[in-house]
């Protein structure tokens, strides 16, 4: 929330600098995310008085003598501004000065005439009409004649000010206003708070047409309405326009500006209905009817449900309660009468409405954090005061106060000094506790025992709920957290911090992937149906059982992911389009599987390892090798079997990944028709290879050994034998290796090192060359032993798979 330093000074006599106040606010629990110096970009720009102005013949320039006080009384500056004249007071940027945007001004000749600076327009100082009158005039900024030459321009045009951008925590709804922060400033500086004026006079006029009925008191506990007539719309005074502009709101008209001003100053969102557009003048606050429509002030049409609260003129909705007014009742230049609304709406309902409709506004942001009834009353009174202060209307006696019960009083607690100190773990003197609570506007009455006190919280502090713990927090943030001495709990034991076994496992997995040349990616947990369409996922596939987002942040992010593959493929395509011709990426993240739809409980979150490798030189076996090394790092081996039913993978270059015979994932080359549908750069479409894979992490972890097992080093060397086999083209390599190992238990490892095809081998056949590693058990292997093993293996391959030695 943005708060203007000069605005705070209207309520508190601040005797510290903005920087010191920033520190004090932080110490009492308010983080200033940014302290903006409005004049920081301007230096050495002062008030200059043009004492002499002579047109330069043949040009549009004027040669001026400028009095800049202590900076020089006769400085020559040339200008092409048409409105310059002798006696003019205007900003003068001197030699070596800087302007917004990093512009530096230096003395230099202008069309051959010496110019020792520049005379400035309002635009060149970053000003507009809301910040300073005349700032948008074409030409130089004409300053008042009482400005003193040499005065820094920041002091003249109001740029000697600061904006505090303060982070307001969700529990401190009372501080989402200038007044709320001013209360805290007054307390931390131990200064009195000067409340904004809320007095106003009421005429005798009562409008018999008006009535207000609240049909949903659970969603609207308090609704105040006040009729104002004889409205004169026009421009707001400069002080109001300036404060609105610096806090991020544009000036519209005096009446609309009052509602925005009260929201910033008091924290109460206000709304003004144009009474000239209301037909029945019967205001009804009710739940919307199913399918009912409303067009809001920003010309957006919404279809409503009974979960939404609307303000109606009879049957016709004229505002979306707590979010935005309707277009059919907006204040216009010809408005002559209005109804002010100041209300307290149920925060949860406003949050659901704003999120559900995707209509987040300043008003809804305030209501979502909570508005007290005190703020509702104060906001209405302040708005009516401003109507009279600005002279733009007659406050009538027609007013309404619809409440679900008696106005809420401040919460009452019985608290003990000893209990507060016990919570804090330190001893804060009783008189200090009393002083702190009183300057925070708590009513405190001590009982005779000197320990018990009766405390009444301010009406605007709805966050004070649980007595002594909340009061302890209030005390310590004012007393100072630095008074707390760090100590161990009495029963505490010193332990070394560490990661859990699963955290170690995840880190190990990531390190193993990085060792294979993969970079970790972190993608959003959302994508769109189109991303699943692009992978040719069937409409009835389990991956289509997805959770849909009610209020997506983008049309491309409408569902929660059921696979990592679409996200990683999008990242790969983006890299290729950016000129990265090759790369390897992985992600270890959750997918979301609903237990049933519509959701009645939280979905299952399963951790998956997704990976993608792309580039002209990538191939299936390189990726397979990376996976084998990954498995080896966990003390297991991966086996593969042909996969022909993964819709987005090439049926001949895809495999399921097995660990201990359990299928844990799949990988392979992206199917040609899927790749053809990608938005790839034209020069890389033909030769680009993309390999995509995904492993269910939790299924994999279930197959990992519980701990390390150690074996003695082998006493005898292994023996290697190369073998070339002729097999059918369709016979997978993994099947051949599995049959070899089943035939001979002494076969420790098998490596495929060549695949060869030719007419001599035969159509539909391929030659596969393997290196077989035999490990002896209790004696060194001789050639005869190895021959016997090979014969056994060949016999098994011929019988099971019809494979012959080449």
Features from the language model and the residues they span:
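Phosphate-backbone binding interfaces of nucleic-acid-interacting proteins
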Residues: 1-202, 206, 339, 356-358, ...
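A carboxyl-terminal module marker
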Residues: 2, 23, 439-442, 448, ...
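Glycine/proline-enriched, intrinsically flexible loops and inter-domain linkers
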Residues: 5, 55, 189, 193-292
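Beta-rich nucleic-acid/ligand-interaction surfaces
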Residues: 39-43, 200-204, 262, 454, ...
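Conserved mixed alpha/beta core segments that line enzyme active sites in large multi-domain catalysts
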Residues: 47-77, 242, 246, 259-328
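Mobile "lid/hinge" segments at catalytic clefts and subdomain interfaces of large enzymes
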Residues: 114-140, 154, 162, 311-409, ...
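Terminal amphipathic helices with adjacent charged low-complexity linkers/tails
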Residues: 189-214, 391-420
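Extended, well-folded interaction surfaces typified by the phenylalanyl-tRNA synthetase beta subunit core
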Residues: 413-581, 721, 773-775, 785-806
């Amino acid at each position: 929330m943005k708060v203007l330093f000069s605005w705070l000074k209207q309520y508190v006599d601040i005797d510290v600098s903005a920087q010191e106040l920033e520190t004090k606010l932080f110490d009492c629990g308010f983080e200033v995310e940014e302290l903006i110096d409005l004049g920081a970009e301007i230096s050495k720009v002062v008030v200059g008085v043009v004492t002499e102005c002579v047109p330069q013949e043949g040009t549009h320039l004027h040669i001026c003598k400028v009095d800049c006080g202590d900076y020089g009384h006769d400085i020559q500056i040339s200008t092409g501004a048409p409105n310059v004249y002798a006696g003019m007071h205007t900003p003068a940027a001197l030699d070596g000065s800087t302007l917004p945007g990093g512009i530096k001004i230096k003395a230099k000749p202008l069309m051959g005439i010496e110019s020792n600076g520049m005379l400035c327009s309002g635009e060149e100082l970053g000003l507009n009409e809301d910040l300073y009158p005349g700032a948008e005039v074409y030409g130089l900024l004409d300053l008042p004649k009482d400005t003193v030459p040499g005065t820094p321009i920041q002091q003249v045009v109001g740029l000697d000010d600061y904006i505090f951008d303060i982070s307001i925590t969700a529990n401190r709804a009372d501080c989402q206003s200038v007044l709320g922060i001013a209360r805290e400033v007054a307390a931390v500086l131990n200064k009195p708070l000067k409340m904004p004026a809320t007095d106003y006079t009421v005429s005798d006029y009562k409008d018999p047409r008006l009535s207000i009925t609240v049909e949903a008191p659970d969603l609207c506990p308090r609704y105040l309405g006040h009729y104002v007539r004889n409205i004169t719309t026009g421009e707001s005074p400069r002080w109001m326009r300036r404060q609105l502009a610096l806090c991020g709101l544009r000036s519209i008209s005096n009446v609309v500006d009052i509602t925005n001003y009260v929201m910033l100053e008091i924290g109460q969102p206000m709304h003004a209905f144009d009474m000239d557009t209301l037909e029945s003048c019967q205001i009804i606050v009710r739940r919307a009817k199913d399918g009912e429509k409303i067009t809001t002030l920003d010309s957006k049409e919404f279809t409503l449900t009974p979960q939404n609260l609307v303000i109606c003129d009879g049957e016709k909705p004229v505002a979306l309660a707590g979010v935005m007014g309707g277009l059919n009742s907006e204040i216009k230049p010809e408005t002559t009468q209005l109804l002010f609304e100041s209300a307290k709406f149920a925060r949860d309902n406003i949050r659901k409405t704003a999120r559900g409709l995707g209509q987040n506004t300043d008003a809804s942001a305030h209501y979502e954090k909570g508005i007290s009834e005190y703020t509702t009353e104060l906001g209405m009174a302040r708005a009516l005061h401003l109507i009279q202060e600005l002279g733009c209307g007659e406050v009538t006696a027609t007013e309404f106060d619809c409440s679900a019960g008696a106005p809420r009083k401040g919460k009452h607690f019985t608290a003990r000094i000893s209990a507060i100190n016990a919570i804090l773990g330190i001893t804060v003197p009783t008189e200090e506790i009393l002083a702190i609570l009183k300057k925070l506007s708590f009513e405190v009455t001590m009982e005779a025992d000197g320990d018990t006190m009766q405390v009444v919280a301010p009406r605007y502090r709805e966050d004070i709920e649980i007595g002594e713990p909340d009061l302890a927090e209030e005390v310590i943030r004012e007393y100072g957290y630095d008074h707390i001495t760090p100590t161990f709990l009495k029963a505490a034991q010193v332990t070394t911090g560490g990661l859990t076994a699963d955290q170690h496992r995840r880190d190990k997995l990531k390190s193993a992937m990085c060792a294979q040349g993969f970079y970790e990616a972190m993608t959003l947990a959302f994508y769109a149906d189109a991303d699943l369409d692009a992978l040719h996922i069937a409409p009835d596939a389990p991956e289509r059982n997805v959770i849909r987002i009610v209020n997506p942040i983008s049309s491309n992010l409408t569902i929660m992911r059921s696979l990592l593959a679409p996200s990683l493929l999008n990242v790969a395509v983006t890299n290729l389009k950016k000129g990265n011709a090759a790369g390897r990426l992985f992600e270890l993240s959750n997918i979301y599987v609903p237990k049933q739809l519509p959701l009645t409980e939280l979905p299952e979150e399963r951790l998956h390892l997704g990976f993608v490798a792309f580039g002209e030189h990538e191939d299936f076996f390189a990726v397979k090798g990376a996976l084998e090394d990954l498995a080896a790092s966990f003390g297991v081996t991966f086996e593969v079997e042909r996969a022909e039913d993964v819709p987005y993978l090439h049926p001949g270059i895809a495999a399921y990944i097995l660990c201990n015979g359990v299928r844990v994932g799949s990988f392979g080359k992206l199917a040609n028709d899927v790749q053809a549908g990608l938005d790839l750069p034209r020069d890389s479409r033909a030769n680009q290879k993309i390999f995509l894979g995904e492993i269910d992490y939790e299924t994999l972890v279930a197959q990992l050994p519980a701990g390390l097992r150690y074996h003695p080093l082998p006493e005898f060397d292994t023996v290697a034998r190369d073998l070339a086999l002729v097999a059918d083209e369709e016979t997978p390599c993994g099947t051949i290796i599995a049959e070899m190992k089943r035939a001979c238990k002494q076969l420790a490892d098998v490596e495929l090192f060549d695949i060869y095809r030719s007419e001599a081998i035969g159509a539909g056949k391929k030659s596969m060359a393997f290196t077989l590693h035999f490990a002896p058990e209790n004696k060194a292997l001789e050639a005869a032993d190895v021959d016997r093993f090979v014969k056994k293996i060949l016999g098994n391959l011929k019988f099971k798979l019809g494979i012959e030695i080449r």
